[in-house]
Amino acid sequence: MPAFADIAIDPPLADSYRALALLRRDRDGGIAPPAVQMVGSGGAVLERDLPMVDLERLTRGGAGERKACAGAMARAASEWGFFQLTNHGVGRELMEEMRREQARLFRLPFETKEKAGLLNGSYRWGNPTATSLRHLSWSEAFHVPLASISGADCDFGDLTSLRGVMQEVAEAMSRVANTVAAALAEELTGRGGGGASAAPWFPAGCDETTCFLRLNRYPACPFAADTFGLVPHTDSDFLTVLCQDQVGGLHLMKDSRWVAVRPRPDALVVNIGDLFQAWSNNRYKSVEHKVVANAKTDRLSVAYFLCPSYDSLVGTCGEPSPYRAFTFGEYRKKVQEDVRTTGKKIGLPNFFKHSSVQ
């Protein structure tokens, strides 16, 4: 019975793996390369703590504390592209409830998740365009537009309490994302007075109609030695706020090597997206990151993506900027085109004023 339940619940990732492994073997004349070459880990991985920031110093502190907190976030955004937040206002009980609802959602049969139109048909798994194991993500997710969560046409099936929990989580993580983004913007421009309302003009065009909440599950993987949970990438947004469980598996590129992020209970992870790097004239870094597969246990996470409308001009914190003007829609279209034609995302180098990317 347990084996049948696993087959019914999980997407056919093993089938994708075997097909890609066979394709790779055929290309290499019947000899598969070592697993570490497939994953591209580049040797031993250090486990590190991300810079830790107490957000309450920004939201409730005096002028000196607000300035120090914003400065700490700006340094982390410049040096790491990632940091963690404590005292962020997203309650432990709410996130535990979100994990319970998330687990119930992902325990549904694969056919139900894929075909029934749950959560506005936002279900996805693996990578349908993968042509090698380097492009395969051992994961499934619901990538839900915020506006859809409260929509009458968004089907939650029998998960009657999921809508309310997702709405609460989205609202709480939205407050965090906008507070952090405004403070980071103020550090570069000197505008505003600190806190969530410091720079209402930034990020331009970002509101509940343009942002996304993503529910992720990384199933235990029997091929964890040579499979990614999520392939290396940067985020095509302004800023991402992540709530992860204690399983671990998030890795980021630091000083030209992969670093494993040590999970911290009750902390949120923040990372800079491509659009913020462009807006900041490369002061803040959108850093490549990945999730490694786990052979023994599932991993769950919830991510909030702060995105503008497709017609929003990304802009700059000040001239001269190394990037030409572009909209979010133009950026997404180019990313999708590159992935389709080359198998990988090129991203910001396409938008340098004097780009050499062909």
From Swiss-Prot:
What are the UniProt keywords, alphabetically? Cytoplasm, Dioxygenase, Iron, Metal-binding, Nucleus, Oxidoreductase
Enzyme Commission code: 1.14.11.13
- Name what cofactor the protein needs: L-ascorbate; Fe(2+)
Single GO biological process annotation from the record: gibberellin catabolic process
> Which SUPFAM superfamilies does this entry report, sorted A to Z?
Clavaminate synthase-like (SSF51197)
Q: Which PROSITE patterns match?
A: FE2OG_OXY
Q: Which GO terms describe its molecular function?
A: gibberellin 2-beta-dioxygenase activity; metal ion binding
Q: Which Pfam families match?
A: 2OG-FeII_Oxy, DIOX_N
Task: List where in the cell it is found.
Answer: Cytoplasm; Nucleus
Q: Which residues bind 2-oxoglutarate?
A: Y218, R299, S301
Extract the InterPro entries matched here: DIOX_N, IPNS-like_FE2OG_OXY, IPNS-like_sf, Iron_ascorbate_oxido_reductase, Oxoglu/Fe-dep_dioxygenase_dom
Is Transit peptide included in the keywords of this UniProt record? no
Residue span, Fe2OG dioxygenase domain: 207-308
Q: Which domain of life is it from?
A: Eukaryota
Residues bound to Fe cation are H233, D235, H289
Q: What does the record's cofactor remark say about binding?
A: Binds 1 Fe(2+) ion per subunit.
Q: Where is it made, tissue-wise?
A: Expressed in panicles. Expressed at low levels in young shoots, leaf blades and elongating internodes.
Which N-terminal stretch is annotated as signal sequence?
A: none
Return the similarity comment: Belongs to the iron/ascorbate-dependent oxidoreductase family. GA2OX subfamily.
Q: What does this protein do?
A: Catalyzes the 2-beta-hydroxylation of several biologically active gibberellins, leading to the homeostatic regulation of their endogenous level. Catabolism of gibberellins (GAs) plays a central role in plant development. In vitro, converts GA12 and GA53 to the corresponding 2-beta-hydroxylated products GA110 and GA97, respectively.
Q: What else is known?
A: Plants overexpressing GA2OX6 exhibit extremely dwarf phenotype and are unable to achieve phase transition from vegetative to reproductive growth. This phenotype can be rescued by application of exogenous gibberellin (GA3).
This protein is called: Gibberellin 2-beta-dioxygenase 6
Species this chain originates from: Oryza sativa subsp. japonica
